[in-house]
Design a protein with these regions (language model features):
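A charged, amphipathic alpha-helical module
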Residues: 2-41, 164, 168, 172-299, ...
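Redox- and metal-dependent alpha/beta enzyme cores, enriched for Fe-S-associated oxidoreductases
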Residues: 55-83, 270-341
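Internal, well-ordered alpha/beta segment that forms a basic, Gly-enriched binding/recognition surface
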Residues: 107-207
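A short, acidic, amphipathic alpha-helical segment used as a generic capping/interface helix at domain edges
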Residues: 103-108, 327-343, 361-365
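An N-terminal, globular interaction/scaffold subdomain
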Residues: 43-110, 132
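Peripheral docking tails and interdomain loops at the edges
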Residues: 3-5, 364-406
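Glycine/threonine-rich flexible loop motifs
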Residues: 124-130, 356-364
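Proline-aspartate-enriched helix->loop->beta-strand connector
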Residues: 113-114, 344-350
Length: 406
């Protein structure tokens, strides 16, 4: 696999023998050119905001939170964008993903042009709301929020009725912006295409259950990140995923381990919590004798496909409401436990990102639940922008893996 000559790539160790990953990465990096050539409206959405309605409207979904950060900071190492975010009016305690996204748009350095800002919001999404408001105002673009109620089993009927009404309002809004009505058939087709990708990720994750782990941590993590907006082309992304899965399945059949894994008997690591900008973390896990066997940062998007046999609106509403990301912390972790068990980990690493309000405040609760349910050692690491905390993270992961090596 050949990589572009960019500063961030020089710091990372990739699996150059995994030919299919080159196509997947190229698809991701070519988003700006493909979007401009499509002539379609671009709808910005946050990472965990469902995209099926956007594609049903004939528009393209775009996750600037992920793309702008990976391209501008992880790859091109443009750290000045945090200053642009501060100039835009946010506090320095915002998480770095939001800071880079906002700085990119505010400065005009965003790679993909955005026509519409529309995203789902749940509890604790005040940073997203603030950033979206500033970006839409700066660009003079239309802005719309829709709400996902917090998961509580005793409020199921009310929550689903509320969510269906929110989705119907979303459909009307997108239709007013794109000129295309979202019909049941269009929504069903978008869900079908989304389900192909969700199944791809389930299949990819299952391959990590093998004793001969066929994909390195960094490649697996990047493959997960790309699903957040379907790379503006669900069909092309599905093709890229299938090529990757087929190549990895062949490795499993032949007992070939990903070349980045350095130990003959690696400590199997499951990563949960916030997605990190510190991509070197994944190389570090393998450098000291570990191997990544699962990562739940985006798994709330594809634990289960959307049911296609029921009313598409009812099925989509129920799927959204049941996403682990929308659950209170204790319920979320408990919902994740069965999927962690399937991956047969030896240890857990919790990823916390500075400025995030995801897991840090409930870290003790998370540790207690994991200890009770899985009886596995747990390490918590905290990262911010790339390279800021790398020495501390390197030391923590090295010591953790050495203590838990078999």
């Amino acid at each position: 696999m050949s990589l572009p000559d960019l500063p961030g790539f020089e710091r990372l160790r990739f699996d150059t023998e995994l030919k299919s990953f080159n196509g997947l990465l190229s698809l991701f990096l070519s988003s700006p050119e493909r979007v401009k050539a499509s002539g379609k409206k671009v709808v910005a959405k946050s990472p965990l905001s469902p995209v099926d309605p956007i594609y049903a409207s004939g528009a393209l979904a775009y996750d600037p939170y992920t793309y702008e950060t990976v391209v501008n900071v992880v790859i091109n190492e443009d750290y000045d964008l945090t200053g642009e975010a501060l100039d835009a009016g946010v506090n320095s305690d915002f998480n770095p993903w939001n800071m880079i996204m906002l700085g990119s748009v505010f400065s005009g350095k965003n790679k993909v042009p955005i026509d519409i800002y529309s995203t789902a919001c749940g509890c604790g999404d005040d940073q997203i709301k603030k950033c979206w408001q500033i970006m839409a105002e700066v660009k003079g673009s239309p802005l719309q929020f829709w709400e996902i109620p917090r998961f509580e089993s005793e409020t199921e009927k009310w929550a689903l009725d509320f969510l269906k009404k929110e989705l119907q309002q979303l459909f009307k809004y997108l239709a007013s912006q794109t000129g295309k009505e979202i019909t049941d058939d269009a929504l069903a087709d978008a869900v079908r295409r989304g389900n192909l990708l969700r199944q791809d990720m389930l299949d990819l994750t299952r391959l990590l259950q093998s004793s001969a782990i066929p994909i390195s941590a960094l490649e697996f993590y990047i493959a997960q990140l790309i699903i957040s907006d379907y790379a503006q082309d669900p069909e092309a992304l599905h093709d890229s995923y299938r090529q990757l899965i087929e190549e990895l399945e062949e490795r499993v059949k032949q007992g070939v381990v990903a070349p980045g894994i350095t130990s003959d008997k690696p400590t199997r690591i499951y990563l949960m919590g916030d997605e990190t900008q510190e991509f070197q973390l994944f190389n570090i896990i393998e450098q000291y004798g570990g191997a990544l066997v699962g990562c739940d940062s985006r798994l709330s998007l594809y634990y289960e496909p959307v049911k296609e046999s029921a009313s598409v609106l009812d099925a989509l509403a129920r799927w959204i409401w049941n996403m682990p990301h929308n659950m209170p912390t204790a319920e979320r972790v408990k919902a994740t436990i069965p999927y962690i068990k399937q991956q047969k980990p030896d240890a857990i690493i919790i990823s916390n990102v500075v400025g995030s309000r995801n897991l840090p405040g409930a870290e003790r609760l998370v540790r207690d639940i994991i200890g009770e349910e899985l009886n596995l050692p747990v390490l918590s690491v905290e990262t911010s922008l790339p390279l800021e905390d790398i020495e501390k993270v390197d030391y923590q992961i090295r010591a953790f893996i050495e203590m838990n090596a078999y």
